[in-house]
Amino acid sequence: MLDSLDLVIDTIVAREVLDSRGNPTVEAEVLLEGGASGRAIVPSGASTGAHEAHELRDGGDRYMGKGVTKAVDHIEERIAPALCGLSALDQGSVDAAMLELDGSDNKSGLGANAILAVSMATARAAANGLGLPLYRYLGGPMATLLPVPLMNVINGGAHAANNLDFQEFMLVPHGAPNFREALRMGTEVFHTLKNLLSERGMSTSVGDEGGFAPDLGNEEAGEVLVQAIEKAGYKPGEQISLALDVASTEFYSDGRYAFSGGSYSSAEMVDQLEQLVNRFPIISIEDGLAEDDWEGWALLTERLGKRVQLVGDDLFVTNTKRLQRGIDANTANSILIKVNQIGSLTETLQAIDLAGRSGYTSVISHRSGETEDTTIADLAVATRAGQIKTGSLSRSERVAKYNQLLRIEDELGDQAVYAGATGQGPRGRD
């Protein structure tokens, strides 16, 4: 019989490991009194929002300044003594203790990478201690909804060394009957796309997130994706639609958007996006405008918010204060959820909850610098978010999340419901 003392935190260890770009990141391991343990590794981003929680790096020459030994030391020397003796079941208290110890507004005291690693590892240790899968521990008996994947098959912007301005062109197989079929559909289009690019004499090398990185214009990318969907035997807009991550903050300066050889005002940028929506089966646009262009976002929401899911990534940075500002101003209609933007599991769950109560969708997301950690797959099911964005159909750190979702779907059996089959995937908002 399980004793409550078995779930008390006994030891916390941390180490510096590598992410998918060969950069150091933080791994934490939480061991409980009863012998159960949980391990987690934090990701890192390339196109990071100015309002994200602080990722602590060492500086200096080692690893070109990107080492994380300071964050590791903070876990073992400051966080561990504060948390040992607390129950791993009380996630809120564990995270609150770390936030109090940090003492800053943006987690610069301990480092968001240190706090998040311990936060996620604690949840996994608690789940293991109870003998539950992580999605069930976090989500309870209602955790049965498998997410629609937003598959980043063409990479540009900060994620690839090519001339493509927009950062991500994604496949959205919302017309599948279940997650397994959605994954198959996306994979078949991915391989068809590779053949089409090869026939055009274009590069089929891949970017940070496993998608192809050819030298294409934004409209050319849309055209070749629609062609790949059709050639693979699917109906664009009906079975598989498109999603964009414009990452417009990356080319925004002095109130103008500079891309494709032009310079555009916020209103002109909205015009550009509307033209793309009119031409292609696009159902979701992420970061269509810059992170602090609130007036532009209001116009974008007015023009396209009923037709298209408008996702705030840099705009909201998984932060309830910024999300509440957007809700109050009727800006965007969806939030991208990145656990390392806010830096703790509790705050991540609070952001998802606020979005849901306000009629906003949530898209659970990876980062461009990923690892083999599959927490976000379980998180997507646990929160019934209905959508996950975890890269292309290549590179093991991306596929690991898809494979975990396959396992979860199998484990749920007849209880499993695919969000696309119930209309709970990407959508606009009246």
From Swiss-Prot:
Binds a second Mg(2+) ion via substrate during catalysis. It is an enzyme of class 4 (lyase). Its EC number is 4.2.1.11. (2R)-2-phosphoglycerate binds at Q167, K338, R367, S368, K389. GO terms for molecular function: magnesium ion binding; phosphopyruvate hydratase activity. The keyword Transferase does not apply. Catalyzes the reversible conversion of 2-phosphoglycerate (2-PG) into phosphoenolpyruvate (PEP). It is essential for the degradation of carbohydrates via glycolysis. This is Enolase. The lineage of its organism: Bacteria, Bacillati, Cyanobacteriota, Cyanophyceae, Synechococcales.
